[in-house]
């Protein structure tokens, strides 16, 4: 080979070394690019990793609240919402009577479930992950994050969408699939009251929310599920070390994203995440979502400790309980 050729090879090798060093040295190096072929799914793998995170861990807890647990036998709860149902049982009973608690049969029957939790982070923008996301058995989305117009980056498949009344400002038919499960995360008794008025077309409630939820919401009641507060409890207790009893004015709680990861570790055998993470605190101008121009300032007063949650997610990544499809 001529000297010029050797110089070119040396230059390429140097560039490769620099790129590898930069990737390793970055704080957000918990990044696992999507393989072209499906990663093998090992039955029980997520459950095994989750037991190290959550301690005395069991999959006996139902994912969604069930009518039979409140109608025939009164299921006692030690905590009020969002960590339990204490004091809200009568209202909850009316909601469970008009909704369902089943998981889709095609998901329930899978021997090994491959899941991805799609966050709302800005780093999904121009990620071109859409096709890869659509290949998972279960795709979990959060709140009002849109799909229409962003399919190339976030995909179009939605198995479940976690939401609460104030985040329900999306068109259930446009931003979801006909068989998507819309999973209500109840933070307070008024959340049950809201979904009851929507589904039963009763007089709407306008007070008791930090942001006015939709008054008209065109949704099929068969798609609605009520998330078991057990997942909020273990996310708060085991991942964030938050006390279950907090003063009303200082209440901290997990984000919907961390809650969704906790749920996925319970439901799935393989768990990947995408679009998680916030800008550094000093970066005041960076938008936090892939679909809207809001910054970290909007999180003030939300009751979420994003720094603490970042540490919890990094711990899960280090343990291999979850893998990341975008930088973190």
UniProtKB/Swiss-Prot annotation:
Cytoplasmic side: 1-7
GO BP terms: glycolipid biosynthetic process; positive regulation of blood coagulation; positive regulation of leukocyte tethering or rolling; protein glycosylation
Glycosylation (residues): 56, 126, 305, 324
Keyword Plastid in record: no
InterPro entries with a match to the protein in the record: Glyco_trans_29, Glycosyltransferase_29, GT29-like_sf, Sialyl_trans
Membrane-spanning parts: 8-25
Keywords carried by this UniProt record: Disulfide bond, Glycoprotein, Glycosyltransferase, Golgi apparatus, Lipid metabolism, Membrane, Secreted, Signal-anchor, Transferase, Transmembrane, Transmembrane helix
Modification note: The soluble form derives from the membrane form by proteolytic processing.
Catalytic activity line of the entry: a beta-D-galactosyl-(1->3)-N-acetyl-beta-D-galactosaminyl derivative + CMP-N-acetyl-beta-neuraminate = an N-acetyl-alpha-neuraminyl-(2->3)-beta-D-galactosyl-(1->3)-N-acetyl-beta-D-galactosaminyl derivative + CMP + H(+); a beta-D-galactosyl-(1->3)-N-acetyl-alpha-D-galactosaminyl derivative + CMP-N-acetyl-beta-neuraminate = an N-acetyl-alpha-neuraminyl-(2->3)-beta-D-galactosyl-(1->3)-N-acetyl-alpha-D-galactosaminyl derivative + CMP + H(+); a beta-D-galactosyl-(1->4)-N-acetyl-beta-D-glucosaminyl derivative + CMP-N-acetyl-beta-neuraminate = an N-acetyl-alpha-neuraminyl-(2->3)-beta-D-galactosyl-(1->4)-N-acetyl-beta-D-glucosaminyl derivative + CMP + H(+); a ganglioside GM1 (d18:1(4E)) + CMP-N-acetyl-beta-neuraminate = a ganglioside GD1a (d18:1(4E)) + CMP + H(+)
Pathway in which the depicted protein is active: Protein modification; protein glycosylation; Glycolipid biosynthesis
Disulfide bridge positions per record: 115-268
Topology versus the membrane: Single-pass type II membrane protein
GO MF terms, alphabetically ordered: beta-D-galactosyl-(1->3)-N-acetyl-beta-D-galactosaminide alpha-2,3- sialyltransferase; beta-galactoside (CMP) alpha-2,3-sialyltransferase activity; N-acetyllactosaminide alpha-2,3-sialyltransferase activity
Subcellular location: Golgi apparatus, Golgi stack membrane; Secreted
Gene3D superfamilies in alphabetical order: Glycosyl transferase family 29
Pfam families with a match to the protein in the record: Glyco_transf_29 (PF00777)
Stretches in topological domain Lumenal: 26-328
Tree of life domain: Eukaryota
EC id: 2.4.3.2, 2.4.3.4, 2.4.3.6
GO CC annotations on file: extracellular region; Golgi cisterna membrane
PANTHER family associated with the record: CMP-N-ACETYLNEURAMINATE-BETA-GALACTOSAMIDE-ALPHA-2,3-SIALYLTRANSFERASE 4 (PTHR13713:SF57), SIALYLTRANSFERASE (PTHR13713)
Family: Belongs to the glycosyltransferase 29 family.
Record function comment: A beta-galactoside alpha2-3 sialyltransferase involved in terminal sialylation of glycoproteins and glycolipids. Catalyzes the transfer of sialic acid (N-acetyl-neuraminic acid; Neu5Ac) from the nucleotide sugar donor CMP-Neu5Ac onto acceptor Galbeta-(1->3)-GalNAc- and Galbeta-(1->4)-GlcNAc-terminated glycoconjugates through an alpha2-3 linkage. Plays a major role in hemostasis. Responsible for sialylation of plasma VWF/von Willebrand factor, preventing its recognition by asialoglycoprotein receptors (ASGPR) and subsequent clearance. Regulates ASGPR-mediated clearance of platelets.
The name this protein goes by in its record: CMP-N-acetylneuraminate-beta-galactosamide-alpha-2,3-sialyltransferase 4
Species: Pan troglodytes
The organism's taxonomic lineage, starting at the top: Eukaryota, Metazoa, Chordata, Craniata, Vertebrata
């Amino acid at each position: 080979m001529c000297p010029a050729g050797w110089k070119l090879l040396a230059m390429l090798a140097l560039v490769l070394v620099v790129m590898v060093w930069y990737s390793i040295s970055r704080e957000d190096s918990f990044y696992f690019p999507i393989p072209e072929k499906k990663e093998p799914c090992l039955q029980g793998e997520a459950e095994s990793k989750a037991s190290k995170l959550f301690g005395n861990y069991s999959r006996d807890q139902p994912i969604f609240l069930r009518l039979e647990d409140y109608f025939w036998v009164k299921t006692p709860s030690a905590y009020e919402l969002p960590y339990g149902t204490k004091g809200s049982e009568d209202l909850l009973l009316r909601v469970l009577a008009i909704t369902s608690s089943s998981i889709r049969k095609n998901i329930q029957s899978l021997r090994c479930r491959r899941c991805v939790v799609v966050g709302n982070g800005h780093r999904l923008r121009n990620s071109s992950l859409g096709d890869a996301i659509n290949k998972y058995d279960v795709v979990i989305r959060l709140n009002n994050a849109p799909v229409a117009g962003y399919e190339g980056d976030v995909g179009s498949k939605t198995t479940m969408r976690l939401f609460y009344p104030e985040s329900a400002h999306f068109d259930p038919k446009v931003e979801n699939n006909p068989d998507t499960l819309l999973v209500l995360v109840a933070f307070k008794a008024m959340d049950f009251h809201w979904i009851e008025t929507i589904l039963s077309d009763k007089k709407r409630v306008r007070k008791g929310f930090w942001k006015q939820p939709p008054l008209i919401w065109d949704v099929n009641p068969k798609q609605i599920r009520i998330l078991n507060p057990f997942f909020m409890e273990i996310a708060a207790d085991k991942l964030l070390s938050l006390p279950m009893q907090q003063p009303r004015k200082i209440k901290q709680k997990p984000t919907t994203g961390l809650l969704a990861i906790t749920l996925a570790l319970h439901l799935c055998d393989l768990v990947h995440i995408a679009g998680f993470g916030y800008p550094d605190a000093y970066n005041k101008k960076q938008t936090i979502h892939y679909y809207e121009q809001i910054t970290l300032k909007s999180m003030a007063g939300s009751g979420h400790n994003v720094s603490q949650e970042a540490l919890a997610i990094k711990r899960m990544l280090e343990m291999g309980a979850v893998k990341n499809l975008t930088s973190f």
